[in-house]
Amino acid sequence: MHILEIPSFFTPYGGEFCLEQAKALKALGHEVRILSHVQLGITIGLKDFFLLPYRRYEHQREGITICQSFQRGVPRMIHHNMRRWVSVVESMFCDYVNRYGTPDIIHAHCAKWAGYAAMKISQTYHIPYVITEHLPKMMLSVEFGDCPEKTWQVPLLKSAYEAADMVVPVSEELVEDVSCYFGTHYRWQFISNTIDTDFFHYQPRSSCEGRRFRFCCVADNSYRKGYDVLIPAFRMLKEQGCDAELRIAGRKTDTTGFRSHLSKGITSLGQLRQEQVRDLLYQSDALVLASRSEVQPLVLLEAMSTGIPVISTSCIPQNLRIEGGCTIVPIDDVEGFSAAMKQVMEKPFNDGLRISEQVKAMASPQAVGKKLESLFRSLLS
């Protein structure tokens, strides 16, 4: 099959799940490329806004050809920016067809706005399209608010959902989570995101006996990630005399303001490269994530894939709650989170290999690639 991936956002603003799925499909013998048009924000990254290329170009990344373009967003002009973004994606698709031919299927990541662009392309070229949805209500509500009937965006995105040949939420809970915006009158099938289980392979840990227990957290500094719960929970743990340390990594976790809230035993590492994240996991005994809203946090899968248990909150989807490897605490429960950390410290953990194998069966590139392949073939038959 000839598959074109279109992400709603991509490097330098994340979106690596698109690349991972493209690699998984290419490994199965398919022709796969990525069409990436990224809107840059002057308030998000001044350097990127001015220095990234102003022209369209192609480049290779981990064996995948990426047709790349950047758009400078105009502050407070959401409607203008969206129309321009979709128009450029349509133009890039035309260029793509002239060079590589018409793809058999379009795989858009997130309805806002790759899914909407895919719908418009599908109407012109009569190509089936699939939307994999990654965004939870908490992230969408920042722009849409709690009154979807008053926003111009929601009807457009809802139409993209309803016209899609299939919507693929990365967790089953996501369907209900975003139903206030998109309803449920569309075809959907759950397929997990993928992680590189060979890269995040299982590795035995040394015994915790006679040394400090090592927690880690890999998450950007944002309200959604719950650092205002995790930090006091860890402080409470230390006040009980527990010998533990917590190392934090993620964007904006190395700012002066963030570090001023850290207590004894907590180290902030800032944003890390993928190899550094893996090293941090291998040096840790458990990962903690006190999130308020998640769809499918890949760092939990990555941690369990390396063989360590995780502690998170009730916003985590059921498919991540691997028995013996994932402890769940209510959202915003400082005392409960601290108690869970203490329990993990005191309970010997010997299930690392079993949990790693379960993650591989659900989220390895081969497992996810085969599920996507089967879905795409069924839509084309």
Predicted regions mapped to residue ranges:
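Nucleotide-activated donor-binding/catalytic signature segment of Leloir-type glycosyltransferases, i.e.
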Residues: 256-275
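N-terminal subdomain of nucleotide-sugar transferases
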Residues: 1-60, 238
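Nucleotide-sugar donor phosphate/pyrophosphate-binding loop at the beta->alpha transition
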Residues: 127-130, 138-159, 197
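Conserved acidic donor-binding segment of nucleotide-sugar-dependent glycosyltransferases
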Residues: 326-334, 342-349
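Aromatic "clamp/platform" in nucleotide-sugar-dependent glycosyltransferases that forms part
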Residues: 292
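Carbohydrate-associated surface elements
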Residues: 173, 194
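Conserved donor-binding/catalytic core segment of Leloir-type glycosyltransferases
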Residues: 4, 168, 207-225, 231-235
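Short hydrophobic beta-strand element within catalytic cores of glycosyltransferases
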Residues: 309-312
